[in-house]
Curated annotation (Swiss-Prot):
HAMAP family: Aldedh_AstD. This is N-succinylglutamate 5-semialdehyde dehydrogenase. Pfam families: Aldedh (PF00171). Catalyzes the NAD-dependent reduction of succinylglutamate semialdehyde into succinylglutamate. The active site is at residues 243, 277. It catalyses: N-succinyl-L-glutamate 5-semialdehyde + NAD(+) + H2O = N-succinyl-L-glutamate + NADH + 2 H(+). Pathway: Amino-acid degradation; L-arginine degradation via AST pathway; L-glutamate and succinate from L-arginine: step 4/5. Keywords: Arginine metabolism, NAD, Oxidoreductase. The keyword Disulfide bond does not apply. The keyword Ribosomal protein does not apply.
Length: 492
């Protein structure tokens, strides 16, 4: 029984599904997808639960959410192992994900008050008030790269605001999704407030097609995000928040400490085996001897990165990709770039057949025409050389995406110029592209999102504002507008 609908664990009536560890092949989870009727059932449960949940005070909802945070803390080791085994991440990285989930609770509570709390301004004849109201029933689509943390970033603020939810995890991480839902159950969520439907494309299409849905919150690929946007077109009454991918540039200008810059680049391009939406995909490197030395050192250090299983000791920097198919797609992308004229500096290698263990790849594309503006979701870094900083900014902006961008340089003036001209939602200076603060908004422009950033701003798309003019009594104004006559004289 792997679906959680209206407080009950039930068996899916759709296609059967098996999840294996992407490195060892061990069977981790087996179950069935939700069919269209069960998706409808989950929606009815969420709709029925909404009025009572929304009418609870914020303090009452907060008690449940904070109880969930305590359960995350007490079950940190077990959840870390589940996420690591299912995604292929090393144990250390899965542990940081669970920590981020825990920290998200307090941050979301604070964001609720700052972004969507109540405000009141006194006026001579009353008051002006601002309140925020929940949308109703929201669908949350989760990604596989952070199957706990990223859905959590939608679910927690949505629940705090008073919404009820239907959650569909990625079909590649059903076990992590189920494990987190069981903790929410232990936290005491009333039946129907949060519902879990497992499944792939068919389940997702049934969920996004629900008429009685008030909104959809999505983190995932640009292709799927565009499909959802088209599916919900003509329905402005539904809130749609899309956080998609990026073809993110990292500009390496002047470098004082080459090893520090190489470390930052590896953290930007290859952490999580390149499976973060903010990962550097394009390295823009200044021409010259210093750039040559940096590139040689980057290749030398990257060659030493050996991916391993989630529980290997000593712990590896990177694990496997989410699947052997995903790893093969990266290799295919590299082969296509090489065929276009790219110069391979470090070839990505699948270490074993029937696993997703893939070493990083680096390929120089300077002077190659027609390079696709696509996100390769894995450890493959493309390199371009530039002569002037103005050229670097033009190259950085030469993408339909706009998620993250970074600069390595000692010059504040160049960062200030980048801040003015960059088209990206995250612009970092001497920090990895993959670094983002939960106390700031997270999202991009262009093909990276639809101007509804998550993290600190998630509260914004989880509630709508209600403005009020209020007075506890009604009296006739001392001064009336022209043409109004309230005298006692009878008009004949």
């Amino acid at each position: 029984m792997t679906l959680w609908i209206n407080g009950d664990w039930i068996t899916g009536q759709g296609a059967s599904r098996v999840k294996r560890n992407p490195v060892s092949g061990e069977v981790l989870w087996q179950g069935n997808d939700a069919d269209a009727a069960q998706v409808e059932q989950a929606c009815r449960a969420a709709r029925a639960a909404f009025p009572r949940w929304a009418r609870l005070s914020l303090a009452e909802r907060q008690v449940v959410v904070e109880r969930f945070a305590g359960l995350l803390e007490r079950n940190k080791g077990e959840l870390t192992a589940i996420i690591a085994r299912e995604t292929g991440k090393p144990r250390w990285e899965a542990a940081t994900e669970v920590t981020a989930m825990i920290n998200k609770i307090a941050i979301s509570i604070k964001a609720y008050h700052v972004r969507t709390g109540e405000q009141r301004s006194e006026m001579p004849d009353g008051a002006a008030s601002l309140r925020h109201c929940p949308h109703g029933v929201l669908a949350v689509f989760g990604p596989y790269n952070f199957p706990g943390h990223l859905p959590n970033g939608h679910i927690v603020p949505a629940l705090l605001a008073g919404n009820t939810i239907i959650f569909k995890p990625s079909e590649l991480t059903p076990w992590s999704g189920e494990a987190v839902m069981r903790l929410w159950q232990q936290a005491g969520l009333p039946p129907g407030v949060l519902n879990l439907v497992q499944g792939g494309r068919e389940t997702g299409q049934a969920l996004s097609a629900l008429e009685d849905l008030d909104g959809l919150l999505f983190t995932g690929s640009a292709n799927t995000g565009y499909q959802l946007h088209r599916q919900l077109s003509g329905q402005p009454e539904k809130i749609l928040a899309l956080e998609m991918g990026g073809n993110n540039p990292l500009i390496i200008d002047e470098v004082a400490d080459i090893d520090a810059a190489v470390h930052l680049t590896i953290q930007s391009a290859f952490v999580t085996a390149g499976q973060r939406c903010t990962c550097a995909r394009r390295l823009l490197l200044k021409s010259g001897a210093q750039g040559d030395a940096f590139l040689a050192r980057l290749v030398a250090v990257s060659q030493r990165l050996t991916p391993g299983n989630w529980d290997d000791e000593p712990q590896p920097f990177i694990g496997g990709l989410i699947s052997e198919q995903a790893a093969q797609q990266v290799v295919t992308a590299w082969q296509q770039l090489e065929a276009m004229g790219g110069r391979t500096l470090l070839a990505p290698r699948l270490l074993q057949s029937e696993t997703s263990l893939l070493t990083p790849g680096i390929i120089e594309m300077t002077g190659v025409a027609g390079v696709p503006d696509e996100e390769v979701f894995g450890p493959l870094l493309r390199v371009w050389r530039y002569d002037s900083f103005e050229e670097a900014i033009l190259m950085a902006n030469n993408t339909r995406f706009g998620l993250s961008c970074g600069l390595v340089s000692p010059e504040r003036e160049k960062f200030d110029q980048l801040l003015l001209e960059a088209r990206a939602g995250i612009v970092n200076w001497n920090k990895p592209l993959t670094g983002a603060a939960s106390t700031a908004p997270f999202g991009g422009i262009g093909a990276s999102g639809n101007h509804r950033p998550s993290a600190w701003y998630a509260a914004d798309y989880c509630a709508w504002p209600m403005a009020s003019l209020e007075s506890d009594s009604l009296t006739l104004p001392a001064t009336l507008n022209p043409g109004l006559d309230f005298s006692d004289e009878v008009v004949r």
